[in-house]
Amino acid sequence: MESLDQAALDQIDRAILALLQRDGRLTGAEVGRRVGLSQPAASARIQRLEKNCVITGYRAVVDPAALGLNIHAVVRLRTTHAQLARALDFASRTSEITSTLRVTGEDCLIFDVHCPQAGRLEEVVDALARYGPVTTSLVLRAYPGKPLAEATPSASRRKTPTPP
């Protein structure tokens, strides 16, 4: 499937995306009501956004502690190009690793890890260390994510808020 060009998204598409990022369970009728379209027109736009891979999925946000995953850590891995594919394969097969970022800088990969206990975190970290040096940080508190900012020329010119 081919992704829509940014220019192909009009203001109504952008409004729909903003609404669905905040609440992916909104019905087509409710989306239509909020953006001034009929239910069929809103649903057709949502289907087009899905078909063109602008909307790539929907998911429930689950509290890890409710599943007994009380240890949350960020693990950074510095590896070699030769080991990169193996490290990524390990991450994809390890259920405690919930997200992986390939980054620039000294580290190559950053993993979000959720474990039931410190002993399991130690096992995951030791296994990752086979691919290179690791640095582990325990997460004290995670704050809610935000919807993606609108990628428009005006958004790229917005000033970064200054601290109080």
Range-by-range predicted roles:
Residues M1-P164:
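A compositional/biophysical signature of low hydrophobicity enriched in polar/charged and small residues
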